[in-house]
Amino acid sequence: MATSASSHLNKGIKQMYMSLPQGEKVQAMYIWVDGTGEGLRCKTRTLDCEPKCVEELPEWNFDGSSTFQSESSNSDMYLSPVAMFRDPFRKEPNKLVFCEVFKYNQKPAETNLRHTCKRIMDMVSNQHPWFGMEQEYTLLGTDGHPFGWPSDGFPGPQGLYYCGVGADKAYRRDIMEAHYRACLYAGVKITGTYAEVKHAQWEFQIGPCEGIRMGDHLWVARFILHRVCKDFGVIATFDSKPIPGNWNGAGCHTNFSTKTMREENGLKHIKEAIEKLSKRHRYHIRAYDPKGGLDNARRLTGFHKTSNINDFSAGVADRSASIRIPRTVGQEKKGYFEARCPSANCDPFAVTEAIVRTCLLNETGDQPFQYKN
């Protein structure tokens, strides 16, 4: 089982320095989505005092030609802070700062999907859209092999590992526990976690978050996971089908509700939203992974608890459907529905924006509507 060389270094030496006092100064780590639409980058600056809100944080810049976001001849890109969290690695008063990215002309970068999403969420704020996203991931060794899998074969068949207990059923629970606690410390709205169906696969849930905050919290939770995995010397992949063959893929099931859906007889509004989604399936498939559906084509096969990528379906307690209505929601006739098609490597801003456009703004067709300022 290959782990990184840095994970074998003496961590006690680092702690000797991390315990030094830092006076009134604060380290703020700025985090952003790079030009791939999947990767995260970060850099740290020193502030003279602890910021009390995100508005007190200064804008910054970076070399976009090194992150697939600009040409080297015009490489300066701008970081605009939009969300602030406690830093679980350096601890208080230090901060994690999630940022939007803007070009030299102050237009949003191509992978800054938050900018448009924020505008769409503001348009429906009176409906109080809530989201919860279930982030699946697979642990790999530094050689790209699933962590804990035999080097020359496969583990036992699926069925033993979901919510599994024991060294032969749940690999690297310590990573999950460290990530969970780090998210709680940071103020990320993490609500649960468990071992998934495939060996070395885990899931954590973020939410419920209202509107734009869903994407902020999920991206920062992903960042924290990558940092935790680095300390343990392994890799977390959000690939939608990291292991070909008879193994589960990885999704990011997205739960959605509005105020009216959560109220008495809200099931009526849930069914109306599902009907709208059924007429716009191709648009949503394109929005549900960063490659416009190509990643999900490997995952949404109609097998391994997925629907077929080409067909829309919905049902109560049906995990092979595009949309699942939880049984308790069907019984209570109010609550939420689960969109099961988003891939594990989706951009949460793209997913939540698409759902709102179709379900609340009543858009139709294969392209998003362009609203005037």
From Swiss-Prot:
Modified residues (Phosphotyrosine): Y104
GO molecular function, one term: glutamine synthetase activity
Catalytic reaction(s) noted: L-glutamate + NH4(+) + ATP = L-glutamine + ADP + phosphate + H(+); L-cysteinyl-[protein] + hexadecanoyl-CoA = S-hexadecanoyl-L-cysteinyl-[protein] + CoA
Activity regulation, per record: Glutamine synthetase activity is inhibited by methionine sulfoximine (MSO).
Location of the GS catalytic domain: 113-373
Amino-acid positions noted as binding ADP in the UniProt annotation, renumbered to this chain: Y336, F337, E338
Superkingdom field: Eukaryota
Binding-site positions, ATP: E134, E203, F204, Q205, I206, G207, P208, N255, F256, S257, R319, R324
Binding-site positions, Mn(2+) 1: E134, H253, E338
Topological type in the membrane: Lipid-anchor
Cofactor dependency: Mg(2+); Mn(2+)
Residues modified as Phosphoserine: S343
Residue sites binding L-glutamate per the record: N246, W247, R319, R340
InterPro entries: Gln_synt_N, Gln_synt_N_sf, Gln_synth/guanido_kin_cat_dom, Gln_synth_cat_dom, Gln_synth_gly_rich_site, Gln_synth_N_conserv_site, Glutamine_Synthetase
N6-acetyllysine: residues bearing it: K11, K14
Family: Belongs to the glutamine synthetase family.
Its biological purpose: Glutamine synthetase that catalyzes the ATP-dependent conversion of glutamate and ammonia to glutamine. Its role depends on tissue localization: in the brain, it regulates the levels of toxic ammonia and converts neurotoxic glutamate to harmless glutamine, whereas in the liver, it is one of the enzymes responsible for the removal of ammonia.
Name recorded for this polypeptide: Glutamine synthetase
Protein's gene: GLUL
